[in-house]
Curated annotation (Swiss-Prot):
Source organism of the structure: Saccharomyces cerevisiae (strain ATCC 204508 / S288c) (Baker's yeast)
Catalytic activity field: S-adenosyl-L-homocysteine + H2O = L-homocysteine + adenosine
Glycyl lysine isopeptide (Lys-Gly) (interchain with G-Cter in ubiquitin) crosslink site(s): K21, K413
One of the GO BP terms on file: phosphatidylcholine biosynthetic process
Name the UniProt record assigns to this protein: Adenosylhomocysteinase
Keyword presence, NAD: yes
InterPro entries with a match to the protein in the record: Adenosylhomocyst_ase-like_sf (IPR042172), Adenosylhomocysteinase-like (IPR000043), Ado_hCys_hydrolase_NAD-bd (IPR015878), NAD(P)-bd_dom_sf (IPR036291), S-Ado-L-homoCys_hydrolase_CS (IPR020082)
Function: Adenosylhomocysteine is a competitive inhibitor of S-adenosyl-L-methionine-dependent methyl transferase reactions; therefore adenosylhomocysteinase may play a key role in the control of methylations via regulation of the intracellular concentration of adenosylhomocysteine.
This enzyme's EC code(s): 3.13.2.1
Required cofactor names: NAD(+)
Length: 449
Protein backbone atom coordinates (compact mmCIF):
# COMPACT_ATOMS: atom_id res chain seq x y z
CA UNK A 1 0.00 0.00 0.00
CA UNK A 2 1.28 3.47 -0.87
CA UNK A 3 1.02 6.55 1.33
CA UNK A 4 -2.50 8.01 1.73
CA UNK A 5 -3.46 10.75 -0.73
CA UNK A 6 -4.04 13.12 2.21
CA UNK A 7 -2.74 12.93 5.73
CA UNK A 8 -6.10 12.68 7.47
CA UNK A 9 -9.68 11.54 7.07
CA UNK A 10 -12.14 12.91 9.59
CA UNK A 11 -15.75 14.09 9.71
CA UNK A 12 -15.32 17.87 9.45
CA UNK A 13 -12.12 19.93 9.57
CA UNK A 14 -14.17 23.07 10.32
CA UNK A 15 -14.63 21.74 13.86
CA UNK A 16 -10.93 22.28 14.60
CA UNK A 17 -11.35 25.63 16.38
CA UNK A 18 -13.97 24.16 18.72
CA UNK A 19 -11.73 21.19 19.38
CA UNK A 20 -8.77 23.45 20.15
CA UNK A 21 -10.77 25.33 22.80
CA UNK A 22 -11.70 22.08 24.54
CA UNK A 23 -8.11 20.80 24.34
CA UNK A 24 -6.95 23.95 26.12
CA UNK A 25 -9.54 23.37 28.85
CA UNK A 26 -8.52 19.73 29.20
CA UNK A 27 -4.83 20.59 29.59
CA UNK A 28 -5.53 22.23 32.95
CA UNK A 29 -7.25 19.02 34.11
CA UNK A 30 -4.40 16.79 32.90
CA UNK A 31 -1.50 17.77 35.17
CA UNK A 32 0.41 14.54 34.63
CA UNK A 33 0.82 15.05 30.91
CA UNK A 34 1.71 18.71 31.37
CA UNK A 35 4.29 17.81 34.04
CA UNK A 36 5.87 15.27 31.69
CA UNK A 37 6.12 17.90 28.95
CA UNK A 38 7.86 20.23 31.41
CA UNK A 39 10.18 17.55 32.80
CA UNK A 40 11.31 16.02 29.51
CA UNK A 41 10.53 18.62 26.85
CA UNK A 42 14.10 19.91 26.63
CA UNK A 43 15.52 16.37 26.47
CA UNK A 44 13.28 15.32 23.55
CA UNK A 45 13.39 11.63 24.58
CA UNK A 46 11.10 10.60 21.71
CA UNK A 47 13.03 12.33 18.93
CA UNK A 48 13.18 9.81 16.11
CA UNK A 49 10.21 7.83 17.40
CA UNK A 50 7.43 7.07 14.94
CA UNK A 51 4.38 6.12 16.98
CA UNK A 52 1.26 4.56 15.48
CA UNK A 53 -1.53 5.04 18.00
CA UNK A 54 -4.93 3.34 18.08
CA UNK A 55 -6.96 4.72 20.97
CA UNK A 56 -10.28 6.55 21.36
CA UNK A 57 -9.89 9.85 19.48
CA UNK A 58 -11.20 12.13 22.23
CA UNK A 59 -10.21 15.53 23.59
CA UNK A 60 -8.17 13.81 26.29
CA UNK A 61 -6.38 11.71 23.68
CA UNK A 62 -5.60 14.90 21.78
CA UNK A 63 -3.64 16.09 24.83
CA UNK A 64 -1.82 12.73 24.87
CA UNK A 65 -0.96 13.02 21.17
CA UNK A 66 0.36 16.56 21.57
CA UNK A 67 2.44 15.46 24.55
CA UNK A 68 4.09 12.75 22.44
CA UNK A 69 4.75 15.32 19.72
CA UNK A 70 6.13 17.79 22.27
CA UNK A 71 8.64 15.14 23.34
CA UNK A 72 9.88 14.74 19.77
CA UNK A 73 7.76 11.94 18.33
CA UNK A 74 6.15 11.70 14.92
CA UNK A 75 2.64 10.35 15.44
CA UNK A 76 -0.20 8.90 13.37
CA UNK A 77 -3.58 8.02 14.88
CA UNK A 78 -6.80 6.05 14.54
CA UNK A 79 -9.58 5.31 17.01
CA UNK A 80 -10.02 1.91 18.65
CA UNK A 81 -13.83 2.09 18.58
CA UNK A 82 -16.25 2.98 15.81
CA UNK A 83 -18.39 5.21 18.04
CA UNK A 84 -15.89 6.82 20.42
CA UNK A 85 -14.32 9.55 18.26
CA UNK A 86 -15.13 13.13 19.17
CA UNK A 87 -15.11 14.75 15.76
CA UNK A 88 -13.96 18.16 16.99
CA UNK A 89 -10.99 16.52 18.71
CA UNK A 90 -10.04 14.68 15.52
CA UNK A 91 -10.36 17.94 13.57
CA UNK A 92 -8.07 19.83 15.94
CA UNK A 93 -5.42 17.12 15.73
CA UNK A 94 -5.67 16.97 11.93
CA UNK A 95 -5.33 20.75 11.75
CA UNK A 96 -2.17 20.55 13.87
CA UNK A 97 -0.53 18.39 11.20
CA UNK A 98 -0.85 14.95 12.80
CA UNK A 99 -2.21 12.29 10.41
CA UNK A 100 -5.48 11.09 11.96
CA UNK A 101 -8.04 8.72 10.50
CA UNK A 102 -11.13 8.65 12.70
CA UNK A 103 -14.74 9.81 12.86
CA UNK A 104 -17.75 8.94 14.98
CA UNK A 105 -19.95 6.25 13.43
CA UNK A 106 -17.45 4.34 11.29
CA UNK A 107 -18.51 1.04 9.77
CA UNK A 108 -16.46 -2.04 10.64
CA UNK A 109 -14.82 -1.84 7.21
CA UNK A 110 -14.00 1.85 7.62
CA UNK A 111 -12.61 1.15 11.08
CA UNK A 112 -10.08 -1.35 9.74
CA UNK A 113 -9.31 0.94 6.81
CA UNK A 114 -8.47 3.77 9.21
CA UNK A 115 -6.11 1.61 11.24
CA UNK A 116 -4.28 0.52 8.10
CA UNK A 117 -4.13 4.03 6.62
CA UNK A 118 -2.24 5.37 9.61
CA UNK A 119 0.53 2.82 9.10
CA UNK A 120 1.43 4.44 5.79
CA UNK A 121 1.10 8.08 6.82
CA UNK A 122 4.57 8.67 8.27
CA UNK A 123 6.84 11.15 6.52
CA UNK A 124 9.07 9.90 3.71
CA UNK A 125 7.20 6.56 3.69
CA UNK A 126 9.01 5.46 6.84
CA UNK A 127 7.66 2.65 8.99
CA UNK A 128 6.48 2.84 12.57
CA UNK A 129 8.94 2.00 15.32
CA UNK A 130 6.51 2.12 18.26
CA UNK A 131 2.88 1.08 18.77
CA UNK A 132 0.47 2.60 21.27
CA UNK A 133 -2.65 0.44 21.43
CA UNK A 134 -5.99 0.10 23.20
CA UNK A 135 -7.65 -3.28 22.80
CA UNK A 136 -5.09 -4.95 20.55
CA UNK A 137 -6.55 -4.36 17.09
CA UNK A 138 -3.54 -2.39 15.83
CA UNK A 139 -1.14 -4.89 17.39
CA UNK A 140 -2.98 -7.77 15.71
CA UNK A 141 -3.12 -6.06 12.31
CA UNK A 142 0.61 -5.31 12.27
CA UNK A 143 1.58 -8.80 13.48
CA UNK A 144 -0.67 -10.61 11.02
CA UNK A 145 -0.70 -8.38 7.94
CA UNK A 146 2.43 -6.22 8.14
CA UNK A 147 5.02 -8.21 10.14
CA UNK A 148 7.83 -6.45 8.24
CA UNK A 149 7.00 -3.33 10.25
CA UNK A 150 8.09 -5.10 13.42
CA UNK A 151 11.71 -5.48 12.29
CA UNK A 152 12.78 -2.09 13.67
CA UNK A 153 9.98 -1.71 16.21
CA UNK A 154 11.07 -0.99 19.79
CA UNK A 155 7.82 -2.38 21.16
CA UNK A 156 4.27 -1.52 22.09
CA UNK A 157 2.26 -0.31 25.05
CA UNK A 158 -1.29 -1.55 25.72
CA UNK A 159 -3.96 0.48 27.49
CA UNK A 160 -6.77 -1.84 28.49
CA UNK A 161 -7.58 -5.13 30.20
CA UNK A 162 -8.89 -6.76 27.03
CA UNK A 163 -5.77 -5.89 25.07
CA UNK A 164 -3.52 -7.15 27.85
CA UNK A 165 -5.33 -10.50 27.89
CA UNK A 166 -4.71 -10.66 24.15
CA UNK A 167 -0.99 -9.94 24.64
CA UNK A 168 -0.57 -12.74 27.17
CA UNK A 169 -2.35 -15.10 24.78
CA UNK A 170 0.03 -14.05 22.00
CA UNK A 171 2.99 -14.79 24.27
CA UNK A 172 1.57 -18.20 25.14
CA UNK A 173 1.09 -19.00 21.45
CA UNK A 174 4.53 -17.66 20.48
CA UNK A 175 3.04 -14.92 18.29
CA UNK A 176 4.29 -11.77 20.02
CA UNK A 177 7.37 -10.45 18.19
CA UNK A 178 8.29 -7.30 20.16
CA UNK A 179 8.45 -6.22 23.81
CA UNK A 180 5.13 -5.02 25.21
CA UNK A 181 4.38 -2.88 28.24
CA UNK A 182 1.16 -3.62 30.08
CA UNK A 183 0.02 -0.11 30.98
CA UNK A 184 -3.32 -1.37 32.28
CA UNK A 185 -1.75 -2.98 35.35
CA UNK A 186 0.02 0.15 36.49
CA UNK A 187 -1.72 1.00 39.75
CA UNK A 188 -2.30 4.57 38.60
CA UNK A 189 -4.18 3.19 35.62
CA UNK A 190 -6.26 0.23 36.79
CA UNK A 191 -7.16 1.59 40.23
CA UNK A 192 -8.03 5.02 38.88
CA UNK A 193 -9.17 4.93 35.23
CA UNK A 194 -10.96 1.59 35.57
CA UNK A 195 -12.50 2.36 38.96
CA UNK A 196 -12.99 6.10 39.38
CA UNK A 197 -13.32 6.82 35.67
CA UNK A 198 -16.14 4.31 35.23
CA UNK A 199 -17.75 5.46 38.46
CA UNK A 200 -18.47 8.80 36.81
CA UNK A 201 -18.74 8.08 33.10
CA UNK A 202 -21.14 5.09 33.23
CA UNK A 203 -24.01 7.07 34.70
CA UNK A 204 -23.23 9.97 32.37
CA UNK A 205 -23.67 7.66 29.37
CA UNK A 206 -26.88 6.04 30.62
CA UNK A 207 -28.43 9.38 31.59
CA UNK A 208 -27.60 11.11 28.31
CA UNK A 209 -29.00 8.20 26.35
CA UNK A 210 -32.22 7.54 28.25
CA UNK A 211 -32.90 10.25 30.87
CA UNK A 212 -33.89 7.36 33.13
CA UNK A 213 -34.33 7.80 36.89
CA UNK A 214 -31.90 5.32 38.43
CA UNK A 215 -33.06 5.70 42.03
CA UNK A 216 -35.11 2.67 43.03
CA UNK A 217 -34.29 0.71 39.87
CA UNK A 218 -32.82 -2.79 39.99
CA UNK A 219 -29.42 -2.57 38.30
CA UNK A 220 -27.36 -5.61 37.34
CA UNK A 221 -23.58 -5.30 37.02
CA UNK A 222 -21.89 -8.25 35.32
CA UNK A 223 -18.36 -8.54 36.69
CA UNK A 224 -16.81 -7.10 39.85
CA UNK A 225 -13.28 -6.25 38.77
CA UNK A 226 -12.04 -2.67 38.95
CA UNK A 227 -14.50 -1.54 36.25
CA UNK A 228 -17.39 -3.43 37.85
CA UNK A 229 -16.57 -1.99 41.26
CA UNK A 230 -16.75 1.54 39.88
CA UNK A 231 -20.01 0.86 38.04
CA UNK A 232 -21.67 -0.79 41.03
CA UNK A 233 -20.66 2.09 43.30
CA UNK A 234 -21.98 4.65 40.81
CA UNK A 235 -25.35 2.95 40.46
CA UNK A 236 -25.73 2.47 44.20
CA UNK A 237 -24.78 6.11 44.70
CA UNK A 238 -27.69 7.07 42.45
CA UNK A 239 -30.06 5.03 44.61
CA UNK A 240 -30.31 1.89 42.48
CA UNK A 241 -30.59 -1.55 44.06
CA UNK A 242 -27.52 -3.28 42.65
CA UNK A 243 -27.09 -6.97 41.88
CA UNK A 244 -23.71 -8.38 40.82
CA UNK A 245 -22.83 -11.46 38.76
CA UNK A 246 -19.37 -13.02 39.01
CA UNK A 247 -17.39 -16.16 38.10
CA UNK A 248 -14.51 -15.50 40.50
CA UNK A 249 -15.12 -16.47 44.16
CA UNK A 250 -12.77 -13.76 45.44
CA UNK A 251 -14.50 -10.98 43.51
CA UNK A 252 -17.88 -12.43 44.46
CA UNK A 253 -16.89 -12.36 48.13
CA UNK A 254 -15.71 -8.76 47.77
CA UNK A 255 -19.06 -7.79 46.27
CA UNK A 256 -20.98 -9.56 49.02
CA UNK A 257 -18.87 -7.90 51.72
CA UNK A 258 -19.69 -4.52 50.15
CA UNK A 259 -23.37 -5.31 50.56
CA UNK A 260 -24.25 -6.30 47.00
CA UNK A 261 -26.40 -9.34 46.31
CA UNK A 262 -24.43 -11.73 44.10
CA UNK A 263 -26.64 -13.75 41.75
CA UNK A 264 -26.55 -15.45 38.37
CA UNK A 265 -27.57 -13.67 35.19
CA UNK A 266 -30.31 -16.26 34.76
CA UNK A 267 -31.93 -15.06 37.99
CA UNK A 268 -31.10 -11.39 37.52
CA UNK A 269 -32.52 -11.24 34.00
CA UNK A 270 -36.08 -11.60 35.35
CA UNK A 271 -35.90 -8.56 37.62
CA UNK A 272 -33.15 -6.26 36.35
CA UNK A 273 -34.17 -2.93 34.85
CA UNK A 274 -30.66 -1.73 33.95
CA UNK A 275 -27.94 -4.16 32.85
CA UNK A 276 -24.23 -3.27 32.57
CA UNK A 277 -21.56 -5.71 31.35
CA UNK A 278 -17.99 -5.06 32.53
CA UNK A 279 -16.25 -8.41 32.11
CA UNK A 280 -14.13 -8.39 28.95
CA UNK A 281 -15.66 -11.80 28.18
CA UNK A 282 -18.24 -12.85 25.59
CA UNK A 283 -21.91 -13.95 25.73
CA UNK A 284 -22.57 -12.43 29.15
CA UNK A 285 -26.10 -11.45 28.12
CA UNK A 286 -27.66 -13.83 25.60
CA UNK A 287 -31.01 -14.54 23.99
CA UNK A 288 -32.40 -16.41 26.98
CA UNK A 289 -31.66 -13.42 29.19
CA UNK A 290 -33.26 -10.95 26.76
CA UNK A 291 -36.49 -12.95 26.70
CA UNK A 292 -36.68 -12.88 30.50
CA UNK A 293 -36.19 -9.13 30.87
CA UNK A 294 -38.97 -6.82 32.03
CA UNK A 295 -40.43 -4.16 29.74
CA UNK A 296 -37.93 -1.57 28.50
CA UNK A 297 -34.95 -2.98 30.35
CA UNK A 298 -31.87 -0.93 29.50
CA UNK A 299 -28.88 -2.99 28.35
CA UNK A 300 -25.38 -1.60 27.92
CA UNK A 301 -21.71 -2.55 27.96
CA UNK A 302 -18.64 -0.79 29.31
CA UNK A 303 -16.12 -3.49 28.38
CA UNK A 304 -13.87 -2.92 25.39
CA UNK A 305 -15.55 -5.09 22.71
CA UNK A 306 -19.19 -5.57 21.72
CA UNK A 307 -19.31 -9.34 22.26
CA UNK A 308 -20.30 -9.20 25.93
CA UNK A 309 -23.89 -8.68 24.79
CA UNK A 310 -25.21 -11.00 22.08
CA UNK A 311 -26.28 -8.18 19.79
CA UNK A 312 -26.35 -10.55 16.80
CA UNK A 313 -29.07 -12.64 18.48
CA UNK A 314 -31.04 -9.52 19.27
CA UNK A 315 -30.91 -8.30 15.68
CA UNK A 316 -31.77 -11.72 14.27
CA UNK A 317 -34.67 -12.49 16.61
CA UNK A 318 -36.30 -9.17 17.40
CA UNK A 319 -39.66 -8.57 15.74
CA UNK A 320 -38.89 -4.89 15.34
CA UNK A 321 -36.13 -2.39 16.02
CA UNK A 322 -36.78 1.33 16.31
CA UNK A 323 -33.89 3.76 16.50
CA UNK A 324 -34.88 6.32 19.12
CA UNK A 325 -31.82 8.52 18.60
CA UNK A 326 -28.12 7.92 17.86
CA UNK A 327 -26.85 4.95 19.90
CA UNK A 328 -30.28 4.19 21.41
CA UNK A 329 -32.30 1.33 19.86
CA UNK A 330 -35.56 -0.21 21.14
CA UNK A 331 -36.13 -3.87 20.22
CA UNK A 332 -39.48 -5.68 20.34
CA UNK A 333 -39.06 -9.33 21.35
CA UNK A 334 -41.27 -12.40 20.95
CA UNK A 335 -42.19 -12.04 24.62
CA UNK A 336 -44.09 -8.91 23.67
CA UNK A 337 -41.70 -6.81 25.74
CA UNK A 338 -39.06 -4.32 24.64
CA UNK A 339 -35.38 -3.94 25.52
CA UNK A 340 -33.37 -0.78 24.99
CA UNK A 341 -29.82 -1.32 23.72
CA UNK A 342 -27.28 1.46 24.11
CA UNK A 343 -24.32 2.12 21.79
CA UNK A 344 -25.07 -1.08 19.87
CA UNK A 345 -23.43 -3.06 22.67
CA UNK A 346 -20.18 -1.09 22.55
CA UNK A 347 -18.70 1.22 25.18
CA UNK A 348 -21.67 3.13 26.56
CA UNK A 349 -19.63 5.85 28.21
CA UNK A 350 -17.96 6.78 24.92
CA UNK A 351 -20.81 5.91 22.56
CA UNK A 352 -23.48 7.81 24.48
CA UNK A 353 -21.31 10.37 26.31
CA UNK A 354 -17.74 11.66 26.20
CA UNK A 355 -15.96 8.97 28.22
CA UNK A 356 -13.86 9.42 31.34
CA UNK A 357 -13.01 12.82 32.74
CA UNK A 358 -9.76 14.50 31.78
CA UNK A 359 -8.14 14.20 35.22
CA UNK A 360 -8.35 10.42 35.49
CA UNK A 361 -7.28 10.01 31.87
CA UNK A 362 -4.20 12.08 32.69
CA UNK A 363 -3.20 9.27 35.07
CA UNK A 364 -3.62 6.61 32.39
CA UNK A 365 -2.02 8.60 29.60
CA UNK A 366 0.95 9.61 31.75
CA UNK A 367 1.67 5.89 32.04
CA UNK A 368 1.38 5.56 28.27
CA UNK A 369 3.89 8.34 27.63
CA UNK A 370 6.35 6.94 30.16
CA UNK A 371 5.94 3.50 28.61
CA UNK A 372 6.72 4.86 25.15
CA UNK A 373 9.84 6.60 26.49
CA UNK A 374 10.89 3.44 28.33
CA UNK A 375 10.58 1.34 25.16
CA UNK A 376 12.29 3.85 22.88
CA UNK A 377 15.17 4.42 25.31
CA UNK A 378 15.44 0.82 26.51
CA UNK A 379 18.86 0.37 24.91
CA UNK A 380 20.10 3.89 25.72
CA UNK A 381 22.15 3.25 28.85
CA UNK A 382 23.29 6.87 29.21
CA UNK A 383 19.67 8.10 29.21
CA UNK A 384 18.66 5.55 31.83
CA UNK A 385 21.63 6.44 34.03
CA UNK A 386 20.88 10.16 33.79
CA UNK A 387 17.16 9.72 34.47
CA UNK A 388 17.13 7.37 37.46
CA UNK A 389 13.39 6.80 37.22
CA UNK A 390 14.11 4.83 34.02
CA UNK A 391 16.99 2.76 35.42
CA UNK A 392 14.88 -0.39 35.56
CA UNK A 393 13.21 0.04 32.17
CA UNK A 394 15.34 -1.98 29.85
CA UNK A 395 16.70 -3.54 27.87
CA UNK A 396 13.40 -5.39 27.31
CA UNK A 397 13.08 -8.96 26.11
CA UNK A 398 10.14 -9.99 23.91
CA UNK A 399 7.29 -10.49 26.35
CA UNK A 400 4.86 -8.49 28.48
CA UNK A 401 6.31 -6.09 31.07
CA UNK A 402 4.97 -3.56 33.58
CA UNK A 403 6.41 -0.18 34.48
CA UNK A 404 8.52 -0.10 37.67
CA UNK A 405 6.95 1.14 40.89
CA UNK A 406 9.01 4.34 40.89
CA UNK A 407 7.28 5.48 37.66
CA UNK A 408 3.86 4.47 39.00
CA UNK A 409 4.47 6.61 42.07
CA UNK A 410 5.76 9.46 39.90
CA UNK A 411 2.47 9.49 37.98
CA UNK A 412 0.56 9.77 41.25
CA UNK A 413 2.78 12.64 42.43
CA UNK A 414 2.15 14.56 39.21
CA UNK A 415 -1.55 14.73 40.14
CA UNK A 416 -1.46 15.56 43.85
CA UNK A 417 -0.99 19.32 43.50
CA UNK A 418 -4.24 19.81 41.61
CA UNK A 419 -6.10 18.15 44.48
CA UNK A 420 -4.37 20.12 47.22
CA UNK A 421 -2.66 17.03 48.61
CA UNK A 422 0.40 17.38 50.85
CA UNK A 423 2.49 14.27 51.42
CA UNK A 424 4.01 13.34 54.75
CA UNK A 425 7.78 12.84 54.50
CA UNK A 426 9.62 9.91 56.01
CA UNK A 427 12.39 10.78 58.43
CA UNK A 428 15.73 9.05 58.09
CA UNK A 429 14.98 6.98 61.19
CA UNK A 430 11.58 5.96 59.83
CA UNK A 431 13.11 5.11 56.47
CA UNK A 432 15.70 2.86 58.09
CA UNK A 433 13.07 1.26 60.32
CA UNK A 434 10.82 0.40 57.38
CA UNK A 435 13.70 -0.49 55.09
CA UNK A 436 12.50 1.71 52.24
CA UNK A 437 14.09 4.80 50.62
CA UNK A 438 12.99 8.19 51.93
CA UNK A 439 11.82 9.16 48.42
CA UNK A 440 10.32 5.78 47.53
CA UNK A 441 9.33 3.50 46.02
CA UNK A 442 7.19 2.93 49.11
CA UNK A 443 5.60 -0.41 48.29
CA UNK A 444 6.79 -3.77 47.00
CA UNK A 445 5.68 -4.82 43.53
CA UNK A 446 3.34 -7.43 45.01
CA UNK A 447 1.48 -4.91 47.20
CA UNK A 448 -2.28 -4.74 46.54
CA UNK A 449 -3.62 -1.23 46.86
Amino acid sequence: MSAPAQNYKIADISLAAFGRKEIELAEHEMPGLMAIRKAYGDVQPLKGARIAGCLHMTIQTAVLIETLVALGAEVTWSSCNIYSTQDHAAAAIAASGVPVFAWKGETEEEYLWCIEQQLFAFKDNKKLNLILDDGGDLTTLVHEKHPEMLEDCFGLSEETTTGVHHLYRMVKEGKLKVPAINVNDSVTKSKFDNLYGCRESLVDGIKRATDVMLAGKVAVVAGYGDVGKGCAAALRGMGARVLVTEIDPINALQAAMEGYQVVTMEDASHIGQVFVTTTGCRDIINGEHFINMPEDAIVCNIGHFDIEIDVAWLKANAKECINIKPQVDRYLLSSGRHVILLANGRLVNLGCATGHSSFVMSCSFSNQVLAQIALFKSNDKSFREKHIEFQKTGPFEVGVHVLPKILDEAVAKFHLGNLGVRLTKLSKVQSEYLGIPEEGPFKADHYRY
